[in-house]
Amino acid sequence: SPTVHEPATDGLASAHVPPLGLSNRAVEGASEVAAFTKPPNPEQLQSLTLWPEMEKLYGHGYELLSVAMDTNTHMIASTCKASTPAHAVVRLFDAQHRFEPAKDALEGHTLSITRVAFSPCGTYLLTVSRDRSWRMFRRTPSGYVAWIGERAHARIVWDGAWAPHSRMFATASRDKSVKIWTLVDDAQRPYRLVTTLNASDAVVSVTWASDGALAMGLENGDVWLYTCAQDGTWQLHTTLARHHTGPVHRVACRPQGRWMDEYDR
């Protein structure tokens, strides 16, 4: 009969971050840690859990703004604060090959790239920026190459997100709007604007649900949920007024549902 192995009881119980360090270290002989009765806060995660560091990735000149990973190719993309085109780039790292950095960074923006997002199919990489534009890169056998883009908003573009089927994407801006785009079979202009959803305040974040609903987080703390009717028109489904006391910087839908998690500062 198969042998059942009991979990080890002498494992490391906690960790801490040294005063001048960036990574947590195991604490030997730590006292017994009580089981959590509610989700741990950041301080508890830092002091009572051990997440082994695998690698540090370098290359940017300033603090990071956005990080994303493609689960198809295991590529990691990162961006940083930038006031010049030289720093407004996407750097790629191959997690399957010892986090080897790509030879060339992806260029095209002139100011900070505020969000980078891989399409679910792994073919495209979307970026949005403080320069009020979005750009898209397409994966080829030799790597990602610049493909399409547009200066689409009147103010900073804070977020960009892909629909589950990888044919549509949304961009959220400080100009109080979310624009929905779709890829089309047109060699001259392989994308078109589907619609513009106007909000009552600056839109800071946007995401798609698995059923195609669209959620947006506003600067005033509101969360709005839109759904698409059978005739293709978008309708405001739910408004969570002043759901937070500050800007809703991220919204996330459950993988197999419509409900959201929202995060402010």
Predicted region positions:
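WD40-repeat beta-propellers
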Residues: 1-2, 39-43, 79, 87-95, ...
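Short C-terminal beta-strands that terminate individual repeats in beta-propeller domains
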Residues: 47, 55-59, 102-108, 146-152, ...
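Conserved strand-to-loop turn within each blade of WD40 beta-propeller repeats
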Residues: 79-86, 128-131, 171-175, 202, ...
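Canonical WD40 repeat/beta-propeller blade segments in eukaryotic WD-repeat proteins
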Residues: 62-69, 111-118, 154-162, 200-209, ...
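Terminal intrinsically disordered, low-complexity extensions flanking WD-repeat/beta-propeller proteins
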Residues: 1-62, 200, 204, 219-222, ...
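Short coil/turn linkers that define WD40 beta-propeller blade boundaries
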Residues: 98-100, 142-143, 186, 231
